[in-house]
């Protein structure tokens, strides 16, 4: 059947900010969907609050709303745009929950909007645990024994029947939020209490424990003619009990017998039919008891999910693209496969390789968090690798993580029993502990007993260990041994450490013996048909599939797995660079290993190499490209710190680096040399010094005065940074933080209190500067720029300051020798402009600045990298001629970027949320943007989009450090004028009352029960009578009362503000929300407004 012709306009809901459990994979899915809709002639309206996405590029959809994804806001967009249909299956749980709310509120019916891709009934059947149980039964499957509960009393009764341990799963949450394993009553109160709160329907499923069973997923698609295909089977290496997003997974499933696979397949097909998914995809999770083979259906997602992105990249089968076509009414046999161009989508993909995905965690950012892996997802990113066998794919995936100690090691003196005891608890180290225990002499039976990891995988670890012994014991590294090692995924560095030689020496020997990888193709059909999209992976096989190409290629190194400090923003710059270079006629090559991202889509670049971003793997890709037609050069400054770290080594190997040279990159990172650049430019940095020991650091701190900011050299995301107020704190820091970069000295800077921090993104071509944007931070200096809210254009900086910023940026760019993008952080204190740091690369603010000013900076940077000038780009229309981002006219729209933080995901071993206090080390996973005519409404939108809409009435708890009390008086007066009740502890309340401000006193936590019936702030928070918390930490109480209050508020979803600067902005936003209703405006309309403001009132007339 051909597509429907009645759908002229479709609203797509994105997934919003990157959070744990819902990440870049939805930008990848959404971007594909929008492209399909446009190709089919449909008008596309998009709502997504995340500016760091490709899908929110104004060129993609017809109307792009970077607005909060709340039912009320989406209803306004529907009222304004009047779409025919809503496609909610590509924006994760956020989009599904919003669609359900719009349906319940009657909005869809009122405006005649049809839901496509999934119907409400199918969503309810798939997501509602009680209804889904019935579905499984009717489909001939079995569910774990369970009870649905809505209160703690019901939960306690259910446990009488199920017995401990029980699994707790809330309805309608994603990434396992609020779920966990309860071993006793205390656990049940803690986990089930949180689960009832996180579930929008206050509904929780308690089920019998299936801990230690094997876990599988099937990725399915079905069309309206009842054609069903299984796109991919995925097996978790970790047994049930670890969230699938935190587990190492492998595709295709390795340990299923054919009969077991057919059983799972039959159940899946029956379930997808029973649920009624008839125009799209879903994934179904199973548990299989290794003892008796009993199969239990765990759950399904009636939408495109994290697993769909993995399955798409693993198979080359574009699930999101095909799901969108199905939603438009096509059937599978009518949709051609892009890769083969001969087979339809109804052909199930066939794999002649193995894919392994390994999660990446960020526990180092939350030292207080419990690192045990449970059913609540905690990983912040993932790496994927492809090999001809499991061992090769696993070892490639592990080295793709780029974390110290992520590659398998082979210590000869380990205690197998101690390692197995450690491995019996699921943590990030379980895989290496198990492999090393086997290396040290543990048996497969003992390892299975301790970990419940299937013996087939344990046998593969033994095989890797045997090859390691062969490498260690061989008299010489001959060709046969090197080939065997490489076929099992050993890197030159691993071989070197086993042979006590340098990786470069191993590489030399390997090349001399002619042991080089070949590149194979992901083609969906195991080479049965020709593949037209070059999507490659390396293997030490016999023949290569890289075809000769005309013209030299430009290679872009991606940013690897997402992590805190290096996320989707860098992928955005890589994708934009590819687009700009392809438009200019260059052949582009992308090298990356992150399955979630747009950059690893097979049609973004001319060729995609799905490879680890290590020196060894990148040099081999360059060699393959050289051999097949030549390389113009490599871009290293777009993907964050990952490719930047390789710049000098690549240059040393004779690889041409495009854009800013490695010498210039080093100059900006090197303390002493950069100080000379500033000196020559007549600019100042805060007083600073370097230290290699505590005595050194103490001497520098005494010279420049406390507080000081201490950090290691060469880090991204403020890793290991701290503000230190005393000698004791300095001693503690030196004792704990010297491991980060052992060969680099520690940096000690004077910390500027109460300074305004300014962030600048600019382009420089060697003669001319284009100032991309000047952002003013809302919090004072001292909070990492990635965690701080910022506004563009600045709201309190005068033209003279902007002129000084422009001059300083130009002098630094020229002094460093930048060709392309540079990001500089300034601090303005007592009217002195200090230079904090300069990064000659794409920064995490590039997407935000590009969206706010309507100028694609990363595209322009790529063109400068291949030799074009800013003047050329102005002439070509890529950069504006009349203005730049530092001289935006009055009347330009105001954009606010706000960080989104993952504190609810991380709990201490006692089960409390980790502290939400911000500092110089970055902790946010994502960002949102609020954009409007004025700052106050733009800021209000950013807070709503970040998940904590500000209250417009109610009770506000305030408790501030002494240094903030003067500021608080004015702010509290405004609160009272707005009709809020102010609640405070003794000291702060006394100050407020002396200034004529009524304040209700509550007891400090330590004084619980001592005051006359006032109750503590914690009791009031739990009773739901506090709507907003302002708590700024003082040196002493930061870890006691303050922490308890912030942790309780965070876990209860009450907005917590930790600086008076941000609280001031919140007050403006609350006033704006009270006085008028905000409107929704598309990016395209904002851009038109900006052009109108530039042209001036005459043009408008």
Swiss-Prot record:
Tell me if Ligase is a UniProt keyword of this record. Answer: yes
Binding-site positions, Mg(2+) 4: 837, 839
Q: Where does Mg(2+) 1 bind?
A: 285, 299
MGS-like domain span: 948-1093
How cofactor binds (record note)? Binds 4 Mg(2+) or Mn(2+) ions per subunit.
**Segments for region (Oligomerization domain):** 403-544
Q: How does it assemble?
A: Composed of two chains; the small (or glutamine) chain promotes the hydrolysis of glutamine to ammonia, which is used by the large (or ammonia) chain to synthesize carbamoyl phosphate. Tetramer of heterodimers (alpha,beta)4.
According to UniProt, the name of this protein is Carbamoyl phosphate synthase large chain
Recorded source organism is Micrococcus luteus (strain ATCC 4698 / DSM 20030 / JCM 1464 / CCM 169 / CCUG 5858 / IAM 1056 / NBRC 3333 / NCIMB 9278 / NCTC 2665 / VKM Ac-2230) (Micrococcus lysodeikticus)
Gene responsible for this protein: carB
